[in-house]
């Protein structure tokens, strides 16, 4: 589940594609460009709505004989749109709780939003509360702790910053092919640490 960072690409060079190619996983990319964790109304493009849509389908075959893992990556559109960190947290919590109730044995990994060049390197204030991208990263980590799921701080692992990020981003926001590969590998390593 995620936004355009995961959803803009659906081939082997996508982040889920990298994960599938380097492991025995069978990824299902449920990310949607322009989506957020924040839910404004039922049936919108938010994470809670995406989870409800997913749970309403026939997913019995997904976990047959396999370990089910949900990778969640939201936050950039919440920040860009100016949704509050509080509403972002509520959306993440609602989606994660629904997945936990439906699949209590599944592994859940929340991946933080990646470093960006736009919006003054994520330091521009897009709402009346002066919240910056780092606040959404911290909120994602807090939700992971509260829900007792795993968390990957993409910024800490990848070490993208103002000096090197242009080499990993295609448009100041979305990872390029190398960036997607590196993020996919980071997710694999994070899952390997928690999976038997």
Regions inferred by a protein language model and the residue ranges of each:
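Generic structural signal for well-ordered alpha-helices
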Residues: 92-96, 137
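Conserved SGNH/GDSL esterase-like catalytic core that processes O-acyl groups on lipids
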Residues: 5-93
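Short hydrophobic segments within beta-strands
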Residues: 1-2, 111
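N-terminal cationic-hydrophobic initiation segments that often serve targeting/anchoring roles
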Residues: 20, 62, 96, 100-101, ...
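A short helix->loop->beta-strand "cap" motif at the edges of active sites that frequently abuts
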Residues: 103-107
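Catalytic His-Asp segment of secreted/periplasmic serine-dependent ester chemistry enzymes
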Residues: 114-196
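Structural beta-sheet core signal
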Residues: 72, 109-111
């Amino acid at each position: 589940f995620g936004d355009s960072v995961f959803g803009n690409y659906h081939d082997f060079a996508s982040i889920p594609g990298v994960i599938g190619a380097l492991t025995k996983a069978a990824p299902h990319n449920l990310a949607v460009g322009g989506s957020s964790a924040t839910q404004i109304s039922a049936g919108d493009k938010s994470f809670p709505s995406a989870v409800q849509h997913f749970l309403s389908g026939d997913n019995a075959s997904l976990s047959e004989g396999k370990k089910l893992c949900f990778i969640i990556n939201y936050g950039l559109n919440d920040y860009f749109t100016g949704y509050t960190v509080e509403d972002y947290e509520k959306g993440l919590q609602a989606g994660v709780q629904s997945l936990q109730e439906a699949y209590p044995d599944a592994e859940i990994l929340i991946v933080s939003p990646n470093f960006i060049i736009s919006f003054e390197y994520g330091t521009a204030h897009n709402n009346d509360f002066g919240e910056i991208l780092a606040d959404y990263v911290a909120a994602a980590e807090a939700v992971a702790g509260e829900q007792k799921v795993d968390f990957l701080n993409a910024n800490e692992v990848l070490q993208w910053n103002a000096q090197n990020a242009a080499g990993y981003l295609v448009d100041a926001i979305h990872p390029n092919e190398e960036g997607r590969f590196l993020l996919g590998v980071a997710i694999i390593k994070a899952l390997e640490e928690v999976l038997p």
